[in-house]
């Protein structure tokens, strides 16, 4: 059996002033770029989320640190997950960083940086559920976040008729709590962050199905930016800065 791997445009919220539909600013010939636009989906704790109107999370802090190393400001564009790659392809953002798994299909549309984090797809069910593993999920309603690898591979394994898709995964948890779906497939750290807040309602199954590599997506052919991002990631790995950020959010 294939292992699990980890739409309408959502409202756009920008740190700073970015006009709707505006492309990422290109510097004048010979001028240094002073700002990069990062698109993300801030509904994916602990990687990206909003707290009191402020963007926080592993990806947010990593992106800001990369910006510091490159000597540029990083501006955040908050959009639906399935709009991230099209936004990078169109030039409306310089890069996407959103707990995004590297897949062969996605590599046809964008270029990916070096891996900065790995994750595991996991299954979450109601605390009193009889579901113990993947073999019990056939014929059940399964919730996923639209456009994620969980969506892609669950659709393949269980059929489209079994899927319930949500632009915000937290909406899936609310649906499961009210009995509308039977299980959710989501990245393990996201599952932990949500279940910790409501352990009386949900439980995470012990079986892990696959590891996934997270990386930053840039427009195909933008080797200059990709090389700079890769250098920053490599430095953050070697000097412990990346681990410090991850450890801050994942205990």
Q: Whereabouts are the PLM-identified features?
A:
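Short helix-initiation/N-cap motifs at beta->coil->alpha
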Residues: 75-87, 129, 146-149, 164-178, ...
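Short, low-complexity disordered leader/linker segments with a strong preference
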Residues: 1-35
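Extended ligand-binding regions for polar small-molecule ligands
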Residues: 60-69, 128, 141, 146-149, ...
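Acidic, polar ligand-binding/catalytic clefts
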Residues: 68, 73-136, 202-203, 207-208
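Ligand-binding clefts/hinges and TM-proximal coupling segments of bilobed small-molecule sensing domains
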Residues: 24-26, 73, 149-167, 202-208, ...
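Periplasmic-binding protein-like
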Residues: 42, 117-125, 192-234, 251
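Extracytoplasmic small-molecule ligand-binding "clamshell" domains
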Residues: 30-99
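A ligand-binding cleft/hinge motif common to bilobed small-molecule-binding domains
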Residues: 100-108, 153-155, 182-211
């Amino acid at each position: 059996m294939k292992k699990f791997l980890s739409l309408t445009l959502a409202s756009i919220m920008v740190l700073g002033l970015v006009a709707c539909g505006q492309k990422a600013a290109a510097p004048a010939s010979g001028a240094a770029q002073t700002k990069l636009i990062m698109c993300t989906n801030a509904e994916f704790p602990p990687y990206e989320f909003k707290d009191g109107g402020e963007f926080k999370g592993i990806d947010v802090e990593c992106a800001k640190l990369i910006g510091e190393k490159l000597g540029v400001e990083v501006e955040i564009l908050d959009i639906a997950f399935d709009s991230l790659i099209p936004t990078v392809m169109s030039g409306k953002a310089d890069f996407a960083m959103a707990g995004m798994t590297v897949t062969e299909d996605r590599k046809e549309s964008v270029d990916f940086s070096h891996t900065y984090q790995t994750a595991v797809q996991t299954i979450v069910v109601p605390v009193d559920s009889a579901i113990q593993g993947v073999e019990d999920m056939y014929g059940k309603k399964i919730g996923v976040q639209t456009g994620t690898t969980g969506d892609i591979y669950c659709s393949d394994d269980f059929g489209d008729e079994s899927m319930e898709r949500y632009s915000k995964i937290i909406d899936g948890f609310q649906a499961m709590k009210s009995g509308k779906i039977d299980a959710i497939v989501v990245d393990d750290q996201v599952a932990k962050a949500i279940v910790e807040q409501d352990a009386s309602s949900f439980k995470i199954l012990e079986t892990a199905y696959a590891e996934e590599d997270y990386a930053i997506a840039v427009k195909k052919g933008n080797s200059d930016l990709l090389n700079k991002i890769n250098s920053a990631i490599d430095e953050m790995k070697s000097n412990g800065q990346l681990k410090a950020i991850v450890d801050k959010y994942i205990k």
